[in-house]
Regions:
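Sec-dependent signal peptide recognition
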Residues: 2-9
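Acidic/polar surface patches and capping/hinge elements
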Residues: 19-138
Length: 138
């Protein structure tokens, strides 16, 4: 009898584990992704990397500005009342807009844009990548 119960429990455990292939809807985790601590942590990581890489103040200002602008531009489609910075900043052209019916988690897209721009700016890309992966896992 004990072996039957044990076998049944193993079967149920495997069955439920294999049955959880549900695709997440962006609206389910959008609220969690809008947590400002993710952006603050990303900027703090950028500061740590700049201190480690020893960058001059003019370069540091660009290291902050470009990723933040990238993050803002990725977030603008979710806020129609906000205006894109394209045409207002020297050399910034219009960013391609997503389809109207696209299911996108804009805060996550914003973080992805931030990390992509940040990695392009610094020497210690791996430090930025590790921080990004930690945020994506939460």
């Amino acid at each position: 009898m004990k072996s039957f119960i044990f076998s049944l429990s193993i079967f149920l455990l495997i069955f439920t584990a294999c049955n959880s292939n549900k695709v997440a809807d962006p609206t389910e985790y959008k609220e969690k992704a809008y947590n400002a601590k993710h952006v603050h942590g990303a900027v703090e990581r950028m500061t740590d990397v700049m201190v480690h890489d020893i960058v001059s103040p003019p370069v540091a200002s660009r290291f902050y500005a470009y990723p933040i602008i990238s993050a803002y531009e990725a977030l603008v489609p979710d806020f129609p009342q906000q205006q894109s910075l394209a045409g207002q900043l020297n050399g910034l052209e219009a960013v391609p807009q997503p389809a109207k019916d696209a299911k996108i988690c804009y805060p996550l897209a914003s973080l992805q844009a931030y990390f992509k721009a940040a990695k392009a700016m610094v020497f210690s890309e791996d430090s930025i990548q590790v921080h990004a992966e930690n945020i994506y896992e939460t």
